[in-house]
Amino acid sequence: CFLGNCPDS
């Protein structure tokens, strides 16, 4: 996750 960006991986 990066700055709340958690796609699927």
UniProtKB/Swiss-Prot annotation:
Disulfide bonds join C1-C6. Signal peptide: none annotated. GO terms for molecular function: toxin activity. The record marks D8 as: Non-basic residue surely responsible of very weak activity. It is unsure whether Ser-9 is amidated or not, it is why the two forms have been synthesized. The non-amidated form shows a weaker agonist activity on the zebrafish vasopressin-2 receptor (V2R) (EC(50)=3.6 uM). The state of the C-terminal residue does not impact its 3D-structure. It is found in: Secreted. The keyword Thylakoid does not apply. Keywords: Amidation, Disulfide bond, G-protein coupled receptor impairing toxin, Secreted, Toxin. GO terms for cellular component: extracellular region. Expressed by the venom duct. The modification Serine amide is found at S9. The cysteine framework is C-C. Shows reduced activity vasopressin-oxytocin related receptors. Is active on fish receptors, but not on their human counterpart, supporting an evolved role of this conopressin in the envenomation process. Shows weak agonist activity on the zebrafish vasopressin-2 receptor (V2R) (EC(50)=1.72 uM). Has no effect on all other receptors tested. Belongs to the vasopressin/oxytocin family. This is Conopressin-M2. The lineage of its organism: Eukaryota, Metazoa, Spiralia, Lophotrochozoa, Mollusca.
